[in-house]
């Protein structure tokens, strides 16, 4: 088999290159339909794509022509891609083999014949498997969304064609005979005392009894379970040819999965499916993301005879989220891809749109990934157990990449289980990048932008967090923002919170965050979008134009600034053997410091500023309200505090960064008017920064003024004075407690204290609202009693009433008005009260904890060295690899069923075991000691100097005498106490002197005797 690289003369066979000029994606363009039909009917056999040569039986892994070379340019930034995708001087063509493994990772094994029948029922084997039946169900439409049915009517599901490119990854050893293979297939162990049966006989007897299971569509089937079969897996090394000197394997997908596809034909090879659907590729990456492109790693979309142009790369970052959160995100993404496939009148989308989209899932750490989430990916076909290796030729593997074009969709996601389907599914090109170690989310983005993105060269990159579910048309709406205006470098949509009705009362924290998100999407984001600069595009749901992110020829630019945060927050010392050692060392040497490190906790804010202020460019940022995504928010207070610590510190220092470097805007290509508007926005951000800085002091003053005013005798509220003193002491106690807990204590270890403080501030806020209303009503009553003519101006002559009305209307009234103008008022009725009661905690608790932990520049995760070894692939002298992988159909099918078993049933409830960490316990004792010490001293001071509000109970004429008398008493007590202690010590020393003198006299008398 050989693969001949197309030369430049065949460039007309490639998909048309990206063009940054505006394209009208309007419906009704018949010429665009004709264009799509012509392009989709282009035969794949044109040109010189002779990738199968039976005469030579050789492997030729020359690289396909990079798409970047013939890319249409419309800006100077495109020169970034002038260099070829691969350096051919470093690429070595693999030597030919005498006996190539022509079936590409398939052995001629008669032990399993794919879609065979069950030994009793005569049914296909996969239909009789209970695990398989419970994992797959028919396609189910969402009750709240009927658009998907309309999409299905415009899609021809029986006409999907994948690519047939063949990468021969496994071969027999050329120095051994057919009977001495490098790999021995799985064999069944015959128990001692039994004879081996002849071929064709069954190795077990029928047993009475049967088990009833549900079929794939809900029907009941009865079959008898065979006894367990003992297997021994005597795997030896198998020869792998690799690609460009890297371990790359094309692995067959389990027949248990392929047999579910509507066009599967068991009589044909690979079920009659194209290799793109029948094989999954694994690549062991032994370099860092910055060297992925340089080291000539290649991905499937650009490795086909006609390389595919990626219009949209969807990046999903994952840490330890379970299968439910991952399933929600993938369900939303798959639905969006189906919508793009259904757009028959679009010049860009429509038939075969799935070939322009790559879904990239990056998991942060092999030992951190959730087992059920990994099993879900295996159910989709994009992951197989047993392929990954920890080392390749003594080099550590830094990432495991699995590529597959899946035709498995997600039918339904409940609160506890994910159901798969193969009905009405549009193919999806998926890439699963499993990082070997946990290196934080920003490192995951670096793998996408610096490694995967450099090879695929997508036009638009969409960032999603695992658990964020985009609505049915959100990705198209985001893409349209870039297509309409070539100046748009980044865009974000509206993020909504996942709400449960019962949490409205049981967990007001969730609904309070919902109100915060809604107001931000109604007031903040649209305002910033009007200026062309959004201070932060949330990493949970945003999109960027890939070419706008690129650095200049000197390596300076948005991505360079964006990725500095990874090196500043890295834990531990740098590894000298790391291929990125010099780059990381240089970053740390130039940028280390608390200010810079905290600034890069909000690296997405730095990226936004660098895009708008990019030298010689006029990029803009937009907010797309029609694009929506739902996400989960922290439900626990400890998790919420930790999240906001990073947000507040990062946004505070990032705001300072943008204000200090505002002059960079003048080096951009923005018009003079745009630069003036940007400066107006910067001035607004400066005011907002000042208000945030003094927010805790301002809130205390408002509290003190309202409570003391309510205690005035003229208002006639008798408990006012007493309550003002009680709330003052509790307020100060809460503030001091928060300060003490914030220094060195983890919120999870002292969560009960934080809950108590938040509840107190909620009660305090309710009292302050009552005080404001009571005083306003009293002012109106005074006006009526005075008999003065009622006018509008009269209400504003009363200073207290005027200030209250202005402050209230400028916030809460505007919230109502803006919400109704956007036709989204419901959060004002369901979440407004919760947010108001939580607002004091936002000001006091969150700000105090954030500023007390400025020195904590971590993301809440620590680097680790990885889990147990997965084995090693050895490089031979001829450039091939010796590797041990499962290759028999029995193993592959059993592995697939084992993965489905993990997600078949809901996950068992987690047992909440209260384990007190020793460090948390000692920190708790320390904090309590400090608090008792501080409060007892404060009580003495307050009683003596009348500073704790006690002066409110004393008449002004007697206040001076009372203070003087208490001070005199205090001094008298202190002086006499000091005198007594001195006298006591004097008596003690005299007694010691007398007794010592007595002992010496006795000793001398005894000596004379």
UniProtKB/Swiss-Prot annotation:
Keyword Electron transport: no
Membrane-related topology note: Multi-pass membrane protein
GO BP, sorted A to Z: cell wall organization; chitin biosynthetic process
Transmembrane intervals: 647-667, 682-702, 722-742, 757-777, 804-823, 930-950, 967-987
Keyword presence, Cell membrane: yes
GO cellular component entries: cell septum; plasma membrane
Domain of life: Eukaryota
First-listed, main subcellular location of the protein, grouped into a coarse class: membrane
Keywords: Cell membrane, Cell wall biogenesis/degradation, Glycosyltransferase, Membrane, Transferase, Transmembrane, Transmembrane helix
Biased composition (Polar residues): 1-12, 34-62
Catalytic activity field: [(1->4)-N-acetyl-beta-D-glucosaminyl](n) + UDP-N-acetyl-alpha-D-glucosamine = [(1->4)-N-acetyl-beta-D-glucosaminyl](n+1) + UDP + H(+)
EC numbers on record: 2.4.1.16
Function statement: Polymerizes chitin, a structural polymer of the cell wall and septum, by transferring the sugar moiety of UDP-GlcNAc to the non-reducing end of the growing chitin polymer.
Protein name from the UniProt record: Chitin synthase 2
Originating species: Candida albicans
Organism ancestry: Eukaryota, Fungi, Dikarya, Ascomycota, Saccharomycotina
């Amino acid at each position: 088999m050989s693969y001949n690289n197309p030369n430049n003369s065949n460039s007309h066979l490639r998909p048309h290159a990206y063009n940054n000029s505006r394209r009208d994606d309007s419906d009704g363009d018949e010429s665009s339909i004709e264009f799509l039909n012509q392009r989709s009917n282009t035969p794949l056999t044109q040109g010189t794509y002779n990738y199968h040569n039976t005469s030579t039986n050789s492997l030729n892994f020359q690289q396909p022509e990079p798409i970047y070379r013939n890319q249409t340019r419309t800006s100077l930034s495109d020169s970034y891609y002038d260099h070829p995708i691969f350096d051919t001087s470093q690429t070595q063509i693999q030597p030919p083999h005498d006996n190539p493994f022509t079936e590409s990772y398939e052995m001629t094994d008669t032990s399993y014949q794919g879609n065979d029948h069950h030994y009793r029922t005569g049914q296909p084997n996969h239909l009789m498997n209970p695990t398989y039946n419970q994992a797959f169900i028919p396609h189910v439409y969402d009750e709240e969304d009927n658009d998907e049915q309309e999409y299905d009517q415009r899609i021809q599901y029986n006409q999907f064609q994948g690519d047939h490119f063949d990468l021969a990854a496994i071969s027999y050893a050329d120095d051994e005979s057919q009977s001495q293979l490098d790999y021995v297939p799985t064999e069944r162990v015959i128990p001692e005392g039994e004879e081996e049966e002849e071929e064709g006989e069954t190795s077990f007897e029928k047993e009475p009894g049967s088990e009833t299971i549900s079929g794939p569509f809900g029907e009941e089937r009865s079959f008898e379970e065979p006894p367990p079969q003992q297997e021994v897996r005597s795997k030896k090394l198998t020869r792998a040819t690799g690609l460009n000197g890297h371990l790359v394997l094309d692995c067959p997908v389990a027949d248990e999965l392929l047999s579910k596809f509507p066009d599967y034909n068991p009589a044909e090879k690979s079920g009659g499916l194209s290799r793109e659907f029948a094989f999954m590729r694994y690549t062991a990456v032994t370099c860092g993301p910055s060297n992925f492109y340089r080291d000539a790693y290649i991905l499937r979309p650009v490795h086909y005879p006609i390389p595919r142009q990626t219009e949209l790369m969807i990046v999903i970052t994952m840490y330890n989220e379970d299968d439910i959160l991952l399933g929600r995100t993938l369900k939303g993404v798959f639905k969006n891809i189906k919508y793009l496939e259904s757009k028959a009148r679009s010049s860009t989308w429509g038939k075969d749109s799935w070939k322009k989209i790559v879904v990239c899932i990056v998991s942060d750490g092999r030992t951190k990934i959730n087992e059920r989430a990994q099993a879900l990916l295996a159910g989709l076909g994009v992951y197989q157990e047993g392929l990954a290796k920890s080392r390749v030729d003594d080099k550590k593997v830094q990432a495991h990449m699995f590529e597959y074009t899946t035709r498995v969709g997600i039918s339904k996601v409940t609160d506890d289980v994910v159901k798969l389907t193969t009905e009405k599914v549009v193919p999806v090109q998926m890439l699963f990048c499993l990082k070997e170690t946990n290196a934080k989310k920003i490192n995951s983005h670096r793998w996408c932008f610096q490694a995967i993105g450099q090879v695929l060269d997508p036009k638009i990159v969409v960032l999603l967090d695992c658990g964020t579910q985009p609505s049915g048309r959100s990705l198209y709406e985001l893409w349209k923002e870039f297509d309409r205006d070539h100046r748009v470098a980044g865009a974000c949509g509206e993020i909504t919170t996942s709400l449960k009705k019962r949490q409205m009362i049981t967990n007001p924290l969730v609904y309070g965050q919902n109100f915060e998100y809604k107001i931000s999407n109604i007031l903040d984001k649209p305002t910033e979008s009007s200026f062309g600069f959004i201070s932060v595009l949330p990493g949970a749901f945003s999109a960027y134009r890939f070419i706008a992110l690129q650095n200049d020829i000197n390596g300076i630019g948005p991505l360079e600034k964006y990725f500095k945060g990874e090196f500043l927050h890295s834990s531990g010392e740098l590894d000298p053997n790391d291929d990125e050692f010099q780059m990381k060392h240089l970053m740390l040497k130039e940028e280390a410091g608390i200010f810079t490190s905290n600034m890069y906790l909000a690296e997405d804010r730095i990226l936004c500023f660098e895009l708008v202020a990019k030298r010689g460019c006029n990029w803009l940022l937009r907010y797309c309200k029609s694009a929506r995504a739902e996400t989960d928010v922290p439900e626990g207070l400890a998790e919420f505090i930790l999240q906001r610590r990073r947000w507040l510190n990062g946004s505070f220092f990032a705001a300072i960064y943008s204000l200090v470097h505002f002059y960079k805007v003048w080096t951009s290509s923005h018009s003079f008017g745009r630069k003036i508007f940007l400066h107006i926005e910067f001035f607004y951000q400066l005011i907002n920064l000042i208000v945030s800085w003094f927010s805790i002091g301002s809130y205390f003053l408002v509290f003190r003024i309202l409570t003391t005013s309510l205690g005035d005798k003229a208002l006639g509220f008798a408990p006012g004075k007493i309550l003002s003193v009680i709330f003052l002491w509790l307020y100060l106690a809460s503030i001091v407690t928060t300060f003490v807990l914030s220094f060195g204590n983890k919120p999870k270890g002292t969560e009960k204290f934080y809950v108590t403080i938040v509840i107190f501030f909620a009660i305090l806020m309710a009292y302050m609202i009552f005080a404001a209303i009571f005083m306003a009503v009293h002012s109106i009553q005074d006006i009526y009693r005075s008999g003065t003519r009622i006018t509008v101006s009269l209400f504003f002559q009363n200073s207290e009433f005027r200030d209250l009305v202005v402050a209230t209307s400028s916030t809460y009234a505007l919230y109502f008005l803006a919400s109704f103008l956007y036709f989204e008022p419901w959060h004002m009725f369901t979440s407004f009260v919760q947010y108001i009661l939580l607002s004091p905690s936002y000001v006091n608790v969150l700000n105090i904890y954030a500023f007390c932990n400025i020195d904590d520049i971590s993301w809440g995760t620590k680097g680790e060295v990885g889990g147990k070894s997965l084995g090693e692939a050895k490089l031979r002298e001829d450039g091939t690899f010796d590797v041990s992988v499962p290759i028999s159909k029995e193993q592959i099918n059993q592995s697939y069923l084992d993965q489905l078993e993990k997600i078949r049933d809901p996950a068992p409830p987690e047992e909440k075991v209260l384990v007190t960490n020793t460090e948390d316990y000692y920190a708790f004792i320390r904090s309590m000691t400090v608090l008792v010490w501080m409060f007892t001293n404060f009580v003495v001071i307050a009683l003596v100097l009348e500073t704790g509000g006690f002066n409110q109970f004393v008449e002004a004429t007697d206040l001076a005498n009372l203070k003087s008398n208490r001070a005199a008493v205090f001094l008298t007590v202190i002086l006499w106490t000091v005198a007594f202690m001195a006298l006591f010590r004097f008596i003690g020393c005299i007694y010691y002197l007398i007794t010592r003198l007595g002992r010496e006299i006795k000793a001398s008398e005894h000596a004379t005797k």
